[in-house]
Swiss-Prot record:
Gene designation: PCMP-E80
Record-level Gene Ontology MF annotations: RNA binding
Keyword field: Repeat
Residues in coiled coil: none
Protein name per the record: Pentatricopeptide repeat-containing protein At3g28660
Chain intervals for the UniProt region annotation (Type E(+) motif): 471-501
Matches recorded under PANTHER family: PENTATRICOPEPTIDE REPEAT-CONTAINING PROTEIN, TETRATRICOPEPTIDE-LIKE HELICAL DOMAIN SUPERFAMILY
Family label: Belongs to the PPR family. PCMP-E subfamily.
Gene3D superfamilies documented for this protein: Tetratricopeptide repeat domain (1.25.40.10)
Residues covered by region (Type E motif): 391-470
GO annotation, biological process: RNA modification
Organism of origin: Arabidopsis thaliana
PPR repeats: 77-107, 115-149, 151-181, 182-216, 217-251, 253-287, 288-319, 320-350, 356-390
Amino acid sequence: MSVVSSFHQSWKSLILASQRCNTVKQIKSTHSLFIIHGLHRNTYAISKLLTAFLHLPNLNKHFHYASSIFDSIEIPNSFVYDTMIRICSRSSQPHLGLRYFLLMVKEEEEDITPSYLTFHFLIVACLKACFFSVGKQIHCWVVKNGVFLSDGHVQTGVLRIYVEDKLLFDARKVFDEIPQPDVVKWDVLMNGYVRCGLGSEGLEVFKEMLVRGIEPDEFSVTTALTACAQVGALAQGKWIHEFVKKKRWIESDVFVGTALVDMYAKCGCIETAVEVFEKLTRRNVFSWAALIGGYAAYGYAKKATTCLDRIEREDGIKPDSVVLLGVLAACAHGGFLEEGRTMLENMEARYGITPKHEHYSCIVDLMCRAGRLDDALDLIEKMPMKPLASVWGALLNGCRTHKNVELGELAVQNLLDLEKGNVEEEEAALVQLSNIYFSVQRNPEAFKVRGMIEQRGIRKTPGWSLLEVDGIVTKFVSGDVSHPNLLQIHTLIHLLSVDASQIL
């Protein structure tokens, strides 16, 4: 073998070795050999070494080292830039991905141009850094360059930019520009609506997806079940249940099973929720939280506390903050005052979880339901952190129930300080206070507060209800006169009222 061929064989072996590095120690050793053999100036070889950083479990710790290797390259190519942007997207400094992209496009070399991979990794970095405005500029770039229509990963990334920024109207426009959206893109759009509490719109996307012949995956049905839970669409939830049973996803995917439990619990079928839960072959902390949340909604405090014992004994799962919140809520709805207080006091020692505002809100609510308003105020004043609006709101609700003007005024004052600028919350607090005044015949103060509401230009958000008929969820808003069959509706209500009065 000649000296030249031997030399090239050594280079080839070192480059292959760099691709097998799984620890930073191996990367450093290979880097040292690169320097010894003069490979550290070879762009191709260094690009392979940089790729090894993507396999490290603690990338953040070694990000500076990767950056220094990049800086040592005299003429980086597009693959090196792509790798560094990708490293940034997986680190705790995703914003630096934009820096490397700008270096790339400013490069004088004509052959260095961003590819579809560049934009894919850059969008991931922007999403992680919450650089949504930058993401929208990238959207313009990929449309102009023709990348948007040619690459599915870029399409999904751009769609996620608008979904994560909660610009759902724009997200829908982007989605409609995609020639043949796959199930992943349908999932992203549907999940965007559901995460914003727009369950009805999410279900419409799910139906449209089925009509277009797209086969749902596990994520699709999990999101759709969450939407059913939001709007009380029991009939549609049952249809999805039958669908996942045929697919055997309840046994294979714990999140599908958990979503079913949550859907039935929130749609008023706690017995069915329990039945589904008990048949789950795999359960996680979210499964238990869904069941306990269902028990809490029905005030089944004893059953909720029993779950707290079962979760560790049966599945070896340590309860988290959400599970304990569910148990506290169940205690509040069931009137289990001592059990709730004991749990709050022992949360840190027993479960290693420091109580948060929501846990204190539950206990304040529990004390108020029991008529212990002074004890509730004492607890608030002894909180280790400054009470948030949820805590004072719980006290205010108790003051209205028990007609306590003094504490009601205190709660409202704190709420107005905390919610300054939040029109809806300000209005809610002031309405509560005026109702307390009315309840104790202090009408002048009540009218004064109502005057403050009008003066601030606060308008009460009308109440609404959801009703599912034949799989269609309809929203009824208080005082709405826009329905085309309004006359028939009012006529029927009048007839029903007459019949009811005759029966009574």
